[in-house]
């Protein structure tokens, strides 16, 4: 997560008239040690917020032009009285991530992995400075601070891209939360926390498929491996067309995937999905349970499926 020091350094760069500053100058301006400043600079570079260049014996730091930095600059310029390092730092960024629309404190705690007590405390702080409002039991960002959620999401998105691109080339993120993301790339990845998924993993469950050169990976600290239930959800997130739905049906039948386990995994992926994963999963479950009688246009005829 981004600490108060990270946001303080960003705020200083946003507020200065110099587009480039040395690490030494930053350390002096912020009254930090050179070692602490170098560490914060390195970590912000990993988030995609800044770039560095070595000139002689000096490391020069400048802001990148990613959208969340531009949005943060607009807010800090117009609302200079707000202590944004205090607002955004630590768990604040995770909480803001899930204020893209109104949510209860319980929902925010569940999605953000921040304790409920901390969520309530941070939301109370945000209410006191007018950034967050509350209607019944639901919290939402007040105008003009709605971009704070966009900033949080943008920062995590760029961090995910940079992390994945350290192990491969061009990527396309299909689904993400603040701490997990599903993406496609063109090469194999062998790194801790990255798990092969999608069509390329079906062979591991005795369903060999003709796949394209693309690879799909899930980056997660939650998983120790990709279960059949996870794989089904990932596949639907990648492509919910008839062919991929049939792949999922084959896997469900071959591995005797329990309906409850699949529904539980679908509920995990649903909040940040661009499609209704739970409804799709229920549709597949009902199709198999009824022997194809409960069939939609996107599912095969039962006899055709049994011949697959």
Predicted region positions:
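Short helix-coil-helix linker/hinge
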Residues: 1-9, 85-93
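Short gly/ser-rich loop at a beta-strand->alpha-helix junction or flexible surface loop bordering the NTP-binding
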Residues: 158-231
